[in-house]
Amino acid sequence: MSTFLNASPIFGPVRSRRLGLSLGVNMMPASGKICTFDCIYCENGLNAERPCHEPYNTAAVVLDALEAKLREMAAEGELPDVITFAGNGEPTAAPEFPQAIAGAVVLRDQLAPNSKIAVLSNGTRADRPEVHDALMMVDDNILKLDTVDPAFIQLLDQPVGPYDVEHQIETFASFNGHVIIQTIFLTGEYQGKPIDNTGEEYVGPWLAALERIRPQEATIYTVARETPVAGLAKAAPEVLDAIAARVQALGIPCQVSY
């Protein structure tokens, strides 16, 4: 299936379904993907299909490019709603991610004070003190929790290394509400196994995890672009709405993208 890589170190701005006008920051090189997950729905493709043989971008490279782009956008009269650290893989795995965040906050305050800073992360490095501290600095700390079922995590997200969902929930809770939980709901089949996390056996325990984490918000979405594997399909809008209503019943705001 058709997938794509982002430009580096800056891409966009693009109109995000969830974030508005988003200026992307890519800690990874443009030539490949570096991720601690290998999600079968990833718009950047599977890891093996996008091998990367270059190092992560340094904070200096990222910040120089970010400053230039913000100045260009200011001159054109349209600054981004959000500066989003995302790109071709897991941004928090970059060695100089904390320095890049600290510098981006300074640039934002100077050049685009009304813009938010967001990080889209799978959360696998969020327990590291320097990463945790950096994520506390951003406006939207968006961490992924697609399910709490260990077997389904292995099928859907395919973590590259050890992954303990209980540890992840505890880590996410340690942000004391300064976290947005992002979850994809989808249906289909992969390797002869059903892909569907919309049923009660998945939704119920996921809601229980949200109660423990107490995020400032949850954002749920479904497949919007082509995926690297065949056989995946959108969750129905009415299913997403029903899940969102249950999140909201917990006192947690929930944003839905169909």
Identify the residue ranges that each predicted region occupies.
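Auxiliary Fe-S-binding modules of radical SAM enzymes
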Residues: M1-R18, R50, D64, R71, ...
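Short polar/acidic secondary-structure junctions
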Residues: R15-S16, A30-G32, D109, D146
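Conserved alpha-helical substructure of the radical SAM core
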Residues: G45-V82, P95-Q99
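Short glycine-rich or small-residue beta-strand-to-loop segments that form or flank ligand, phosphate
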Residues: I83-N88
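Conserved AdoMet/S-adenosylmethionine-binding subsite of the radical SAM
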Residues: A93-A233
